[in-house]
């Protein structure tokens, strides 16, 4: 038998195995996909922040093919006076070697990979308008056989004008990447090339503009027994940050520029207490046109009463929903005194220009 015939036979056999495996994993992918939707809806039900709305992720249609399936879903947000529908369309590529991954020379076996795009309706049309893109939001997802996976959410570059506040926003290359393990977000990376906002004088009491370039935020977080408190690390880097303000009443102007800033926030849970450690480094700090040099600080809050911190976070959420904050804060201060918040400043390094600037601005009160 000629070698060419043997090779052809091997190719045909492998193709047959691939087709059979793809069909089998397509069925498994459908089962896993619908299971994940059920888990997601249960999570929505338990999320306290959504108490005023009911959110459901509903599968409308699942058309299973040999190598890929086509899916129609919708997110339903039920509020007191309205229901918002967000349509989604997905292509789910079957394992063990999903075609979209093979096209990128990625041969790592997976149950499935998928690409989800935002559909058009009266609610979502605004996303297409402000981004001028047919793919304003795109979600790429892959799940392996250990039921861990990766999700990548992309927001197309765009511009937005808020008619009520007369504020302008624009952004470019916004990407959120999340590693998933046992249905729990573990690691994430948010990157933004540019973000700008501009709020004029006549819209607010103080005009404000913000410019951000090369923002990267990396985090590894785990939930704790407190709903709003997570343990882990958050690292952020900003290549350039600028904020300019101008008071509508006095006309006083203020300018702040930070270059190459890095920050690390660590939250540790020990029994009923929480430790918060923050480290920050700035290569350059400019205030009102004055270059004040480098800034480095290391601050720790050790052995914070976890219940006190959780109640404070609850109050901040309540304040956002209420007209007055006094009663909430008085109640909290009565229950938790300053001993619940031990502050330890480990180190603070200021450049000589910044030190002189702060000394010049300081107001001394003698007793």
Curated annotation (Swiss-Prot):
Its main location: membrane. The chain crosses the membrane at residues 6-26. The keyword Membrane applies. One of its GO terms (cellular component) is membrane. It is a single-pass membrane protein. It is found in: Membrane. Keywords: Membrane, Transmembrane, Transmembrane helix. To E.coli YdgA and YihF. This is Uncharacterized protein HI_1236.
């Amino acid at each position: 038998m000629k070698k060419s015939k043997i090779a052809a036979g091997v190719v045909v056999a492998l193709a047959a195995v691939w087709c059979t495996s793809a069909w089998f994993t397509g069925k498994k992918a459908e089962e896993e996909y619908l299971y994940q939707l059920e888990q997601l809806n249960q999570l929505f039900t338990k999320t306290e922040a959504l108490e005023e709305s009911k959110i459901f992720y509903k599968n409308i249609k699942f058309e299973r093919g040999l190598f890929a399936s086509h899916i129609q879903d919708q997110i339903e947000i039920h509020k007191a006076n309205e229901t918002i529908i967000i349509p989604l369309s997905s292509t789910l590529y079957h394992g063990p070697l999903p075609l979209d991954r093979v096209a990128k020379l990625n041969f790592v076996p997976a149950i499935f990979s998928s690409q989800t795009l935002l559909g058009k309706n009266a609610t979502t049309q605004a996303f297409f308008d402000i981004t001028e893109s047919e793919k304003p939001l795109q979600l790429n997802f892959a799940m392996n056989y250990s039921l861990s996976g990766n999700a990548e959410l992309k927001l197309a570059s765009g511009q937005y004008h808020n008619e009520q506040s007369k504020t302008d926003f624009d952004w470019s290359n916004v990407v959120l990447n999340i590693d998933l393990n046992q249905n729990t977000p573990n690691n994430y990376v948010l990157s933004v090339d540019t973000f700008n906002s501009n709020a004029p004088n006549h819209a607010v009491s103080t005009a404000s503009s913000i410019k951000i370039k090369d923002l990267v935020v990396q985090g590894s977080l785990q939930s704790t027994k407190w709903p709003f408190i997570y343990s882990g690390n958050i690292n952020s880097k900003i290549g350039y940050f600028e904020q300019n303000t101008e008071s509508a009443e006095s006309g006083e102007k203020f300018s702040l520029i930070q270059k190459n800033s890095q920050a690390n926030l660590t939250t540790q849970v020990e029994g009923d207490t929480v430790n918060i450690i923050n480290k920050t480094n700035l290569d350059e700090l400019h205030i009102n046109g004055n270059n004040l040099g480098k800034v480095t600080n290391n601050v720790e809050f050790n052995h914070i009463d976890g219940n006190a911190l959780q109640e404070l976070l609850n109050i901040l959420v309540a304040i956002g929903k209420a007209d007055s904050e006094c009663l909430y804060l008085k109640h909290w201060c009565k229950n938790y005194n300053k001993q619940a918040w031990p502050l330890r400043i480990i180190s603070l390094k200021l450049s000589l220009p910044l030190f002189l600037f702060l000394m010049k601005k300081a107001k001394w009160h003698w007793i």
